[in-house]
Amino acid sequence: MIKSALLVLEDGTQFHGRAIGAEGTAVGEVVFNTSMTGYQEILTDPSYSRQIVTLTYPHIGNVGTNASDEESSAVHAQGLVIRDLPLIASNYRNEEGLSEYLKRHNIVAIADIDTRKLTRLLREKGAQNGCIIVGELSDAALALEKAKAFPGLKGMDLAKEVTTKEMYQWLQGSWTLEGDLPAAKQPEDLPFHVVAYDYGVKRNILRMLVDRGCRLTVVPAQTPAEDVLKLNPDGIFLSNGPGDPEPCDYAITAIKRFLETDIPVFGICLGHQLLALASGAKTVKMKFGHHGGNHPVKDLDASCVMITAQNHGFAVDETSLPSNLRTTHVSLFDGSLQGLHRTDKAAFSFQGHPEASPGPHDAAPLFDHFIELIEAYRASSVSLNCSNSHK
């Protein structure tokens, strides 16, 4: 049976459509994503916690869903807004239709609305709080009340909500065209030990690090720095994640401690912002953020342009950079800061998503740079140990 659904924004704008997910309400910040594919990866990306995602591509659900394409163990998006849900999912890897998938994960979603109009509104007015409501459509006032009551993401620490509860090891590499996801590698076949902070980490980040020889120990967001240093890592990775970076004082404190050492540090998305804050810079809330797989970014060091995947609503304020931070990448859409490198430490970060999933892999060489820093750190450590042994 077809059920009606209603999306109401905090400014009172209403969109009437059809329910394609669970019954109930979904309240959060409404954003738009311009990716043409990868809706399952988007839904399971922890960075979308407390957000209602509008997908601008008109046909969503064409290839169904499957367990291998999930970026985490749960759906983190608060709700989903699309134009059209195809009747048939055509893909040999399909295990479950999108509508059934949403219902199983208790995600409220709406289809058959004018997503172009909604996107233009969000672009012009900025990201707005909103509410999708199913089953109580006669009370649009209730939906508006819920939308206005949502406090917004500014000041909201969500990393500690989506992080893993326990430390774990990750040894699995990337999916290949010859088959499905590969079996986990043997630890002895992975020469580099990297500790990855899970602020909402995506699985494809972990896979791409394993592809480059990293044996990963993934730790909860609030793990003290001294506990990590006891693990003797060759490198420290700061993951993506949702919410405002400024309230994550536990992370900033830990990163400051790591920067007192010579261990290489690499941050992505929220991790990029946290590295900047730990170095003395500031962050700001963006008007409507960057969400999509077609964002051009200029690499200032290589003087080239990369097409990147983006998903962030906060950014580092370039005017606040201290002297030991230099800009390495900038957005060609709005000029916002996209990459940083410490001038005094082996620490760097990128605002976009070099692992994509979904999106292009133009920025994937950033993982290679991390490995180069790790190799240099290990070489210097060996040299130091040798000189000490001869004293």
Curated annotation (Swiss-Prot):
Catalytic activity from the UniProt record: hydrogencarbonate + L-glutamine + 2 ATP + H2O = carbamoyl phosphate + L-glutamate + 2 ADP + phosphate + 2 H(+)
UniProt GO molecular function: ATP binding; carbamoyl-phosphate synthase (glutamine-hydrolyzing) activity; glutaminase activity
Record keywords, A-Z: Amino-acid biosynthesis, Arginine biosynthesis, ATP-binding, Glutamine amidotransferase, Ligase, Nucleotide-binding, Pyrimidine biosynthesis
InterPro entries: Anth_synth/Amidotransfase, CarbamoylP_synth_ssu, CarbamoylP_synth_ssu_N, CarbP_synth_ssu_N_sf, Class_I_gatase-like, CPSase_GATase1, GATASE
Cysteines engaged in disulfide bonds, as pairs: none
SUPFAM superfamilies reported in the protein's UniProt record: Carbamoyl phosphate synthetase, small subunit N-terminal domain, Class I glutamine amidotransferase-like
Ranges for domain Glutamine amidotransferase type-1: 193-380
Pathway where it operates: Amino-acid biosynthesis; L-arginine biosynthesis; carbamoyl phosphate from bicarbonate: step 1/1; Pyrimidine metabolism; UMP biosynthesis via de novo pathway; (S)-dihydroorotate from bicarbonate: step 1/3
Region (CPSase): 1-189
E.C. code: 6.3.5.5
Keyword Iron: no
SMART domains per UniProt: CPSase_sm_chain
Active site: 269, 353, 355
GO terms for biological process, alphabetical: 'de novo' pyrimidine nucleobase biosynthetic process; 'de novo' UMP biosynthetic process; glutamine metabolic process; L-arginine biosynthetic process
CC annotations in GO: carbamoyl-phosphate synthase complex; cytoplasm
Residues where L-glutamine binds: 47, 241, 243, 270, 273, 311, 313-314
PROSITE patterns documented for this protein: GATASE_TYPE_1 (PS51273)
One Pfam family cited in the UniProt record for this chain: CPSase_sm_chain
HAMAP family membership: CPSase_S_chain (MF_01209)
Family: Belongs to the CarA family.
Function: Small subunit of the glutamine-dependent carbamoyl phosphate synthetase (CPSase). CPSase catalyzes the formation of carbamoyl phosphate from the ammonia moiety of glutamine, carbonate, and phosphate donated by ATP, constituting the first step of 2 biosynthetic pathways, one leading to arginine and/or urea and the other to pyrimidine nucleotides. The small subunit (glutamine amidotransferase) binds and cleaves glutamine to supply the large subunit with the substrate ammonia.
Subunit structure: Composed of two chains; the small (or glutamine) chain promotes the hydrolysis of glutamine to ammonia, which is used by the large (or ammonia) chain to synthesize carbamoyl phosphate. Tetramer of heterodimers (alpha,beta)4.
Entry protein name: Carbamoyl phosphate synthase small chain
Originating species: Yersinia pestis
